Amino acid sequence: MALGRVGLTVGLWGLLWVGVVVVLANASPGRTITVGPRGNASNAAPSVPRNRSAPRTTPTPPQPRKATKSKASTAKPAPPPKTGPPKTSSEPVRCNRHDPLARYGSRVQIRCRFPNSTRTESRLQIWRYATATDAEIGTAPSLEEVMVNVSAPPGGQLVYDSAPNRTDPHVIWAEGAGPGASPRLYSVVGPLGRQRLIIEELTLETQGMYYWVWGRTDRPSAYGTWVRVRVFRPPSLTIHPHAVLEGQPFKATCTAATYYPGNRAEFVWFEDGRRVFDPAQIHTQTQENPDGFSTVSTVTSAAVGGQGPPRTFTCQLTWHRDSVSFSRRNASGTASVLPRPTITMEFTGDHAVCTAGCVPEGVTFAWFLGDDSSPAEKVAVASQTSCGRPGTATIRSTLPVSYEQTEYICRLAGYPDGIPVLEHHGSHQPPPRDPTERQVIRAVEGAGIGVAVLVAVVLAGTAVVYLTHASSVRYRRLR
């Protein structure tokens, strides 16, 4: 019995401990839930002392969980996105090149993209404005700015219209554009909204400001942007050393031709490797032409021909394409010296004879009589002999004397440019005519006058007979 009571007591104590453990295990979740409120400022323990120097803060009550649960439980699924028109971006028109610079004669392509490129009712127009003449577009329009609801300014020429059937009949098409243009200087290729403007040949006429206008057919000026197309053309450089006579100063001329733009073309001269600093020896002039600019620079040496060896000149050209880029080229040449010829004139019988010694090959004589500025009509016979100097010869020309003129001029023709006029003046009294010759001339002149009088009499008689016959015929008809 004692052992049974002891076992019963142990069993009851074991059941009691099991019950305590179960109660503690069930009570732990409830204690975890109450941690949040106890940590809030409104439920802080009153035994904690406050610091008087610390600022007082207004407590924030906790948000009830019920509202959060209710909101989460009543949330509806997000509706699918609407399929309306797409929003316009901050850059509705985007071009890959807003300020292209290309060489003269090259082929230029400009690509631009537009919004709503899949809409078949969209319309694109491209206008061209001359850079220097049209003030309506402003001196420097913003090239990357996209304008909204701005139509093309006046004064432009139409390059392209995607809806040619809607083009104003009074519009002015650019040369090489529009229906039936041949040859075509402009073309637009690519899918709608991603067009490429192709300028077949860039010149001074095709450069300028291009205005792209994009929109719907009923609102064609929705967007617009500017593209500036500029052309450059490097100069061609040539040097021309002047041929001079003995005793003349050496000269050379350099020409920078057909370049664009005409910002600056600077020449620096060298004579036999030494720079020419004296500005009085250099003369430079720039001229604007339809195909660009040309600059001509001439240097005059202090040395003269025949007093030393020929001089070699070098011109150095520096051309500034813009404020940043420039190119530099050189050209050289040696001046030549020609002997100064000696011209003589003599009269032998019925001929005038002119002789010039040591003239360049190809030089001939031209005769002038009296005050007449045209060469003499009579044929002059020329002959040529050796002079003894390479490339030169002695020439002689004869001309029959004139019975009307007393002044004679024989002039050398065929010298290079820059050589002064070389000529000789002479006087000669006309010889007396032969009496027989004079009688023959007078007889011929008298016969000519007689023939003229006879012809006049015959014509007058014929006219009288014709008028008499016509009057008689008319009188008979009246009867």
UniProtKB/Swiss-Prot annotation:
Region entry Disordered, spans: 30-100
Cytoplasmic side: 468-479
TM region positions: 447-467
Positions on the Virion surface side per record topology: 28-446
UniProt region (Heparin-binding domain), positions on chain: 105-119
Sugar-bearing residue positions: 40, 51, 116, 149, 165, 330
Signal peptide: 1-27
All residue ranges annotated as the Ig-like domain in the record: 235-327
Topology in membrane: Single-pass membrane protein
GO biological process assignments: adhesion receptor-mediated virion attachment to host cell; symbiont entry into host cell; symbiont-mediated suppression of host complement activation
Subunit structure, interactors included: Interacts with host complement component C3b; this interaction inhibits host immune response by disregulating complement cascade.
Further comment found in the protein's record: There are seven external glycoproteins in HSV-1 and 2: gH, gB, gC, gG, gD, gI, and gE.
Protein name: Envelope glycoprotein C
Organism: Human herpesvirus 2 (strain G)
